[in-house]
A protein has these predicted regions:
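Active-site neighborhoods and metal-handling regions in enzymes and metal-associated proteins
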Residues: 1-232
Length: 232
């Protein structure tokens, strides 16, 4: 039997994710490094969680590294035209969150705007297709069809999402061969992305409560591209 966590506890963990993205939206600048971004996130998470036991892990990748999906922070220096992915998992108390947003240093190119719109549409179709009783392996194919229809077929090599809560990553994941059923009370993520290896990549991820009727979004944070453009 799966361990279930309350949506209220997940939302408390997500308060730290929200603070982290706010810190980046106001604090990111050209000339900063991935490690600088990490420190902004650390300060924000620590401020929200205070003395409560907590930790965080995540992907802090900028520039062409975004096309390789994931990685720890480095001394890479952000420059105009870069993208930056923050995929952040926070443990607050005994419960984990897991979200992702992508930042743009300057106005995104037309192709990047099209890719981002495809990512959001991909997430939306995932939301429409998941409810209690859904077979996990059935979720990703419609997401991939959305990307292909918009010109980005084959550009998402990873799963479409997974369970979260007692740990930052739990099965079932939304991937081929994972034929477990999603259950009411599960907390899941949907994390579509588009990756142009050697150039750039992007990803958006939210956390949801699985119900008999569908998904309840637990992270009502902005996801529109204009909210994540860093002035250069």
């Amino acid at each position: 039997m799966r361990t279930k966590v309350s949506k209220e506890k997940v939302r408390r963990a997500l308060e730290a994710n929200r603070a982290a993205y706010e810190a980046l939206r106001t604090g990111l600048r050209v000339g900063m490094t991935e490690r600088d971004a990490y420190n902004l996130v650390k300060d924000a998470v620590d401020c929200v969680c205070g003395d409560e036991p907590h930790e965080f892990i995540g992907d802090f990748v900028g520039g062409t590294r975004t096309g390789s999906i994931e990685g720890p922070p480095t001394d890479y220096v952000f420059k105009p035209g870069d993208l930056f992915i923050l995929d952040l998992s926070v443990r607050r108390g005994e419960v984990w969150s897991d979200t992702c947003r992508t930042f743009f240093f300057g106005t995104p190119t037309q192709k990047q705007q099209e890719a981002y719109a495809a990512v959001l549409a991909c997430q939306d179709i995932g939301v429409a297709n998941v409810r209690a009783g859904t077979v996990a392996s059935s979720v990703r194919p419609p997401m991939m069809e959305v990307l292909a229809a918009r010109g980005f077929g084959g550009r998402m090599p990873h799963h479409g999402g997974h369970l979260v809560g007692p740990a930052p990553y739990l099965k079932p994941a939304f991937e081929e061969g994972c034929d477990e059923l999603v259950e009411a009370g599960d907390i899941c993520t949907l994390e579509p992305g588009v990756y142009m290896e050697g150039e750039w990549g992007m990803r958006v991820e939210n956390d949801y409560l699985v119900t008999e009727d569908g998904l309840e979004n637990l992270f009502d944070y902005p996801r529109e591209i204009g909210d994540f453009v860093v002035e250069v």
